C-alpha cells in the first residue's frame, strides 16, 4: 500500500507546473497529521524544497513552514512542523504534531526540479475530537423541592429579667425566603447562635408569637446618664479651683502694690521734714549771734575826754 502511495506522489510531482492538483486530507484534533510529498532523486537529483501555507503556485512559499537544501532542514517556522522522512532520498513529507481545528486550510509542497518547479497542493481539514467518556455532570430529575429554614437564637446567659418600662412589648418575626432547587428533596435547618451576653445587661425583649421563631434580644442598660453626671461634677470642681486661684492672685497682687506705695510715701516725707527744720535753726543761730554782739559791747564804756 505504501509503495502505491509513493508511486502516485511521484507521478504527481512529475506533472508540468501548469497542471494543478488538489488533494484533500482529514485529521483529528490532538493527533498528528502527515501530508505526503516524495520525489525521485534518480531523475533530477537531490534538490531544495519547501512547505508553505496557502496557494503557493504563484507566491512560492511566501508563508513558508520548512525549507531544506536537499539534505537537512535550513528553516523551521515552528517545532510542530517536522520532516520525519529521509530528506536526501526525496521523502519530504510534512508531519504536523498536536493539530488543532485552526490548522485546517491549504498547504503546498514545492520541489525545485531543474528546469521547472513542481507543486503538490493539499487541503487539510481538522475535525474536533469527540469525547467518548460519559458526562460527569449528573442530570437533575424530580419535582421541585422547597427548603424551609428556621432561625433559632440561643443566648448563652441564663439570667432573664423583665424591664418595668411601660412601653409595649416588641415583637420580631424572622421569615426567611424559600429557595427552590431540583436535585433531591432535602430540608435544611439553620441555627444562629448569638455572642456571649455580658453579665451587666438587664433588659430583655422576647417574642413568642410563633413557636418556630423564638428570638430573644438583649438590650444594654442606659449608662451614658451616669457618665454625664460624673463629667458635670468634674467640670464644676475645676471651675471652682480656677476661680479660687484667680482671687488669691488678685489679693496677693493688691497687698504687694499697697506695701510698695506706703514705703515710697515714707521715704519722701523724711527729706521734707528735714529741709523744713533748717531755716528755723539758722534764724535762731543768727539771733544768738546778735545777742552775743550786744553783750560784748556793754563792758567797755567809752572814756570821756
Swiss-Prot record:
Listed InterPro entries: Ig-like_dom, Ig-like_dom_sf, Ig-like_fold, Ig_sub, Ig_V-set, TIM_domain-containing_protein
Keywords carried by this UniProt record: Cell membrane, Disulfide bond, Glycoprotein, Immunoglobulin domain, Membrane, Receptor, Signal, Transmembrane, Transmembrane helix
Membrane topology type: Single-pass type I membrane protein
Keyword Ribonucleoprotein listed: no
Disulfide bond positions: 37-109, 50-61, 56-108
Extracellular side: 22-231
Disruption phenotype: Deletion mutants lead to ferritin accumulation and iron overload in the retina leading to retinal lesions.
Gene Ontology terms, MF aspect: ferritin receptor activity
Main location (coarse class): membrane
Region described as Disordered: spans on this chain: 130-174
Biased composition annotated in UniProt, kind: Low complexity: 131-167
Domain Ig-like V-type: 22-125
Example of a GO biological process term: iron ion transport
Gene3D superfamilies given in the database record: Immunoglobulins (2.60.40.10)
Tissue expression: Expressed on late differentiated Th2 cells. Expressed also on all splenic B-cells, with increased levels on germinal center B-cells, in the liver, especially in bile duct epithelial cells, and in renal tubule cells. Within retina, mainly expressed in Mueller cells.
Residues carrying covalently attached carbohydrate according to the record: 86, 91
Transmembrane segments: 232-252
PANTHER family per record: HEPATITIS A VIRUS CELLULAR RECEPTOR 1, HEPATITIS A VIRUS CELLULAR RECEPTOR 1 HOMOLOG
Further comment found in the protein's record: Belongs to the T-cell and airway phenotype regulator (Tapr) locus, a single chromosomal region that confers reduced T-helper type 2 responsiveness and protects against airway hyperactivity (AHR), the hallmark of human asthma. The human genomic locus appears to lack the Timd2 gene.
Subunit and partners: Homodimer.
Job of this protein: Cell surface glycoprotein that participates in iron homeostasis in the liver, the kidney, the retina and oligodendrocytes by acting as a receptor of H-ferritin. Mechanistically, mediates iron-containing ferritin uptake via an endocytic pathway, trafficking to endosomes and subsequently to lysosomes. Plays also an important role in the regulation of Th2 immunity. Receptor for SEMA4A involved in the regulation of T-cell function, enhancing T-cell activation.
Protein name (database record): T-cell immunoglobulin and mucin domain-containing protein 2
UniProt gene name: Timd2
